[in-house]
Amino acid sequence: MPIAQLYILEGRSDEQKETLIREVSEAMSRSLDAPIERVRVIITEMPKNHFGIGGEPASKLNR
């Protein structure tokens, strides 16, 4: 059972997350020759002040 664990910054819509799950699942199924029903995708949303880019919190960088 292939599992993808994705970390993204908070703020994406449910529709965007659904698209991400679908497209990652399709890519994993295709590239690993695994039935899509066996693919799992876990999304962890992080607050922008819990993620750093270039030594600064993403919240300060307007990301």
UniProtKB/Swiss-Prot annotation:
Molecular-function annotations in GO: isomerase activity
Catalytic residue positions: 2 (proton acceptor)
Family: Belongs to the 4-oxalocrotonate tautomerase family.
UniProt keyword annotations, A-Z: Aromatic hydrocarbons catabolism, Isomerase, Plasmid
Assembly information from the UniProt record: Homohexamer.
Name recorded for this polypeptide: 2-hydroxymuconate tautomerase
Gene: nahJ
InterPro entries named among the record's database cross-references: 4-OT, 4-OT-like_dom, Tautomerase/MIF_sf
